[in-house]
Amino acid sequence: MIMQLGLTSLAFLALKCDAYNIAPKIDTPNVEPFAPSGGLKLLAIVAIIWYVVVLLVAYYGFFEIMQKFSKRKTLPVPPQVEGVTILRPIKGIDPEMELCLQSAFDQDYPKFEIIICVESENDPGIGVAEALIRKYPHVDARILKGDSHNPDHFGPNPKVNNLAKGYSAGKYDIMWILDSNVWVCSGALSRSVDALNRSLDNGRSTFDFQTGKGRKVNLVHHVPMAISINPQTGTNLDEMFLFTSHSKFYISINKAALAPCVNGKSNLYRRSELDLAVKRLGKGSEPSLDGTTGILAKDAAYYGSKPGQGLRFFARYIGEDNMIATALWFQNGGRTGLTGDAAIQPLGGVNSTSLKNYLLRRIRWLRVRKHMVLEATLLEPTTECLLCGTFGTFAISTLFLQSYFNWKFFIFHLLVWMVTDYTQFHILLTNASQDTATCNVPYFAEPNFNAYGSPFESSNLRTFHRWVLYWLLREVLALPIWISAMLGTRIIWRNRPFRINVDLSAEEL
């Protein structure tokens, strides 16, 4: 009875409240609408523009790899055969150096000579070179040794000092600078000469010889890659960097042809073109590669006036590869070209396998690049997966998803980037050594090579969980490496300390 009276009273009260439009009070949380400030919106707009730019550049390179690096390379039939001088600088013993040097002797090209340049007559690498010359008596090959007591010294760059004698002594105008620690396919020289003479970049013409429109290729280079031949952290990270982030942007920038982007592992150009570029530097209109005046113009005029000595001018720079490409590009109005080939370096030396070695190598070259291409180096960390994804997620979340950071989108970004890198890694790994020319492929360049044990017999894919581990580690380390590089100017190269000056030259300490 009491319960019935209570229910009746509640019903009467509800009807009365409804009659007077009185709603019962219910406590609700006070949720403020998402309203970012004008400054944050502007920042998000800038971030999304940059995010889109990075994605466009990255996938521009990725699709070029899918198109031009995903199949067996063919051997062109050149309309005319020009002689080529192959210069291979030696400094000590590198991992699998004999196999790397042998790749020059195996080139499927009818007319070339090999000059092996050695800094000192006591260098231990001389024995390896001499054995190869005996093994290939039909190949025009010789060793040029420096004077151990009075070595060539045109500047602090030991590689240029070593190469200078071979550059001057070469029989042919076309020079192929090929480091002693890289291996190339047997058809690489033929494709490179064809690209130089017909002005091709990955098979596409860049210059109309009838109308004169476009830029003529005057430097041919090959994508640098590295294979870890032992299961060590440092070499695995190098392999991951070169097969993913570096190759993607390296190929993309080269295709866009807005500025030179060249690694010096494997470069082919005409000696007469480089001598001409140095001569023009010395005339004073553009006295140096960074626009400064003074002794650089004087030195350029001196070396440019003597045929076969233009290379010596670049001994003042640690990054001579980029500076040579810059001179050929801006002084001679040329551009660079790729051929679909790779310069493959086996990594596994005693002093190069640790995580510390990897960190020091990356810091060293970032410090060099900081002085050569400052703007690009400052922006570099924003092109890496994690930081780029952070900017992109903030921008898209702020502008479209009513939040400051949507973790679901960030994870989606990471997964797409990782799958892209995984696909690209294995496309390059599978096809880097594939050539229709007769090619003696060394074990480390075989697609199924496994540094962790027996070869991958049924698949050339790296073990996924191990691949992901090194991929994540490399991505996480990218920003700390960049910060460390930006905070210093001193570098250690070939066990020698250097400082990079504001005019881009190097000073040995």
UniProtKB/Swiss-Prot annotation:
Q: How does it sit in the membrane?
A: Multi-pass membrane protein
Q: Which residues form the active site?
A: 321 (proton acceptor)
Catalytic activity annotation: an N-acylsphing-4-enine + UDP-alpha-D-glucose = a beta-D-glucosyl-(1<->1')-N-acylsphing-4-enine + UDP + H(+)
Q: Does the keyword Ribosomal protein apply?
A: no
Q: Where is this motif: (Q/R)XXRW?
A: 361-365
Q: Which residues lie on this side of the membrane: Cytoplasmic?
A: 64-384, 430-466
Task: Topology check: give the Lumenal ranges.
Answer: 1-42, 406-408, 488-509
| Stored Pfam families | Glyco_transf_21
Q: Which GO terms describe its molecular function?
A: ceramide glucosyltransferase activity
Q: According to the UniProt entry, where does the motif D3 sit in this chain?
A: 321
Tell me the null mutant phenotype.
Answer: Results in complete loss of glucosylceramides (GluCers) in mutant cells. Shows increased resistance to plant defensins MsDef1 and RsAFP2, and to heliomicin, a defensin-like peptide from the insect Heliothis virescens.
Q: What is its main location?
A: Golgi
Disulphide-bonded residues: none
UniProt record, GO biological process:
glucosylceramide biosynthetic process
Q: Where is this motif: D1?
A: 123
| Class of this enzyme | transferase
Cellular component per GO, a single term: Golgi membrane
- Transmembrane segment boundaries: 43-63, 385-405, 409-429, 467-487
Localization per record: Golgi apparatus membrane
**Known function:** Catalyzes the final step in the biosynthesis of the membrane lipid glucosylceramide (GluCer), the transfer of glucose to ceramide. Glucosylceramides play important roles in growth, differentiation and pathogenicity.
Its UniProt domain note says: The D1, D2, D3, (Q/R)XXRW motif is a critical part of the GCS active site, involved in catalysis and UDP-sugar binding.
Q: What family is this protein classified in?
A: Belongs to the glycosyltransferase 2 family.
Name of the protein: Ceramide glucosyltransferase
Q: Which organism is it from?
A: Komagataella phaffii (strain GS115 / ATCC 20864)
